[in-house]
């Protein structure tokens, strides 16, 4: 019984491969639509298996560096790659050479940011501004969706917890805008409500 199942599975597999080959190669007229299994058909079926196994090669497994490249470089304690053929004094001189900096790297230098004397005050002001913008955005959203919120309050399963969840959900929408866009939205809604 197991032998006949294996034979049927092989037959199904060969039919699938034959159909797949037909769709891939439109110009091939040597294959027929009959389901006869001959040795030539069996030999043709082995070729796609070889192709698939070649396609299954993982790119990460391929070594792209040659032995010559690996031996020419060494990994120093400071994670600096230094050629091996340099003398000790040349290596020391190389390690003392500072990295080049651009105006952007000078602006974004972490050490300068950390050494800013009033960094705590600046971050506190930013947090206050963010909280203020969040509250203003929540006011806009409750105004926009006021009718919908009233309808929800009338539902029997609406609780105080539901109100908190809705408010937090509406307020979290502020995160999809950057500060300039958010300021524009708040100013625009302030102008329309005053008119």
Swiss-Prot record:
Protein name from the UniProt record: Ribosome assembly protein 3
Compartment annotation: Nucleus, Nucleolus
Matches recorded under PANTHER family: RIBOSOME ASSEMBLY PROTEIN 3
Name of the gene this protein is made from: RSA3
Domain of life: Eukaryota
Family: Belongs to the RSA3 family.
A GO biological process held by the record: ribosomal large subunit assembly
Quaternary organization: Associates with nucleolar pre-ribosomal particles.
Keywords from the named record: Nucleus, Ribonucleoprotein, Ribosome biogenesis
Compositional bias per record (Basic residues), positions renumbered to this chain: 9-21
Chain positions covered by the region annotation Disordered: 1-61
Gene Ontology CC: nucleolus; preribosome, large subunit precursor
Disulfide bonds: none
Functional summary from the UniProt entry: Required for efficient biogenesis of the 60S ribosomal subunit.
Ranges of Low complexity composition bias in the record: 27-38
Chief site of localization: nucleus
């Amino acid at each position: 019984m197991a032998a006949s199942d294996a034979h049927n599975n092989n037959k199904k597999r060969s039919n699938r491969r034959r159909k797949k080959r037909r769709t891939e190669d439109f110009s091939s007229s040597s294959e027929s639509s009959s389901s006869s299994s001959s040795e030539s058909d069996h030999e043709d079926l082995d070729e796609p298996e070889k192709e698939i196994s070649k396609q299954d090669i993982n790119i990460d497994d391929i070594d792209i560096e040659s032995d010559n490249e690996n031996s020419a470089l060494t990994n120093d304690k400071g994670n600096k790659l230094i050629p091996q053929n340099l003398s000790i004094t040349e290596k020391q001189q190389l390690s003392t050479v500072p990295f080049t900096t651009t105006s952007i790297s000078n602006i974004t230098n972490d050490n300068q940011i950390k050494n800013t004397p009033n960094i705590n005050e600046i971050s506190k002001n930013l947090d206050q501004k963010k909280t203020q913008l969040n509250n203003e955005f929540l006011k806009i959203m409750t105004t926009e969706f006021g009718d919908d919120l009233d309808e929800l309050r009338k539902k029997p399963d609406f609780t105080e917890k539901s109100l908190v969840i809705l408010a937090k959900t509406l307020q979290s929408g502020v995160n999809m805008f950057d500060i300039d866009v958010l300021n524009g939205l708040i100013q625009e809604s302030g102008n329309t409500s005053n008119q």
